[in-house]
Amino acid sequence: MDQQENNGFGPIFKPRGKAVTFASVVIAIISGALLVFALWESEDKDGINFVFFATALLMLSVIIGELIRRVSMLAEEIRHKQTRYQGEWRRVFRSTFAFEYGSCILAVGTTSVLFVCYALLQNYEAFFRLDYGIFFILNCFVIPQLVFIVGIREPNTVEATMLNERNNKNVADGFAWNYYFGYLKLVLPRLEAQIAKSSEFRYKITKKKLYILVPKTCYVYDNIADADPRVTWAGDLTPCKINRGGIKERIYKQAVYRVAMTDKHEYFFILEYASNLMSLYDMSLHEDAPLSRQERDDQVVLFIRKLREILEGCKECRGKCEIVPISGDEKSKIADVLVAIHNATQVESDEADL
């Protein structure tokens, strides 16, 4: 792990990939192929035909059953037609019956209908039976409702987090976007100019970027020196004034901190905490905003990942900000982390010059 597991913060997990889909496809193909192969070896052609017929019938019943289950959801959404959908029936139906992979479902449903029709035409007497019809009706009208009522269909933790990560619905995603649009996008493009305006710090600051501390605990000290006495406030950059949210010339300023090491060498960093993380910390303690410690730990990792992704995608902000994950549990470590990052980037810069 880089820099001793991100300065004690721990591993930053990667986004979930397509392994679930791949595994499902492999299981379906292997199990289906083994079943057909076994029937083929026994020379049971009727059995093979039944496998294809049953698969198509089951798939069709699953699709129809899901549509019928959504009819019950429609009963609830109708009650909110005016408040949630501005009285538009089109929005009610789209919200209730829309599928993310609608074209794929339509193709599978059409193929299933064709298979069922073909099987009935080939062997009407074998497949047009009352028990098959009862089975089909149960799977369309009864089973989906029971599955929903008893909670079997409720997404598990993995499925819920996959959906949230894919659709930017995590608390951390909102925090990251808010931090970017409400602050970083405004100050980072102006950062070098503000450094140049500062007669006190323009030559002392060797790394012209904003360093943002992200503690795993989400606890943010009001004064960074309380976390590490070697990191002391040295002053502020020249503030920039921006008209924002109805406030004329709202002031945005960044603090400069001095890091004093035992070798009497001093470093100067534009440094601050990701202050909105304190809201995550407060949520984990507030009884009306249930957020477990594990969920909080996951959200702060997602915050780092999303914020890095956002900043990397913005040309005006790219390379002007360094997100520094720290454990937050141990004091007197911030100076060591900052100096290590400074020295590592200095080595990279020297190697690039060579």
Curated annotation (Swiss-Prot):
Q: Which Gene3D superfamilies match?
A: 1.20.5.5200, Stimulator of interferon genes protein (3.40.50.12100)
Q: Name one GO cellular component term.
A: autophagosome
Keyword annotations from UniProtKB, A to Z? Immunity, Innate immunity, Membrane, Transmembrane, Transmembrane helix
List locations, semicolon-separated.
Membrane
**MF-aspect GO terms:** 2',3'-cyclic GMP-AMP binding; 3',3'-cyclic GMP-AMP binding; cyclic-di-AMP binding; cyclic-di-GMP binding
- Looking at the UniProt entry, the stretches that span the membrane are 20-40, 48-68, 101-121, 132-152
**What membrane topology does the UniProt entry give?**
Multi-pass membrane protein
Q: Does the keyword Metal-binding apply?
A: no
Q: What's a BP term from Gene Ontology annotated to this protein?
A: positive regulation of macroautophagy
Q: Which residues bind 3',3'-cGAMP?
A: N178, Y183, R250, I251, K253, E272, S275, N276
- Stated family: Belongs to the STING family.
Q: What does this protein do?
A: Facilitator of innate immune signaling that acts as a sensor of second messenger signals produced by cyclic GMP-AMP synthase-like receptors (cGLRs) and promotes the production of type I interferon. Innate immune response is triggered in response to nucleotides from viruses and bacteria delivered to the cytoplasm. Acts by binding cyclic dinucleotides: recognizes and binds cyclic 3'-3' linked cGAMP (3'-3'-cGAMP), cyclic di-AMP (3',3'-c-di-AMP) and cyclic di-GMP (3',3'-c-di-GMP) second messengers produced by cGLRs in response to nucleotides in the cytosol, such as double-stranded RNA (dsRNA).
Query: What's the protein called, per UniProt?
Result: Stimulator of interferon genes protein 3
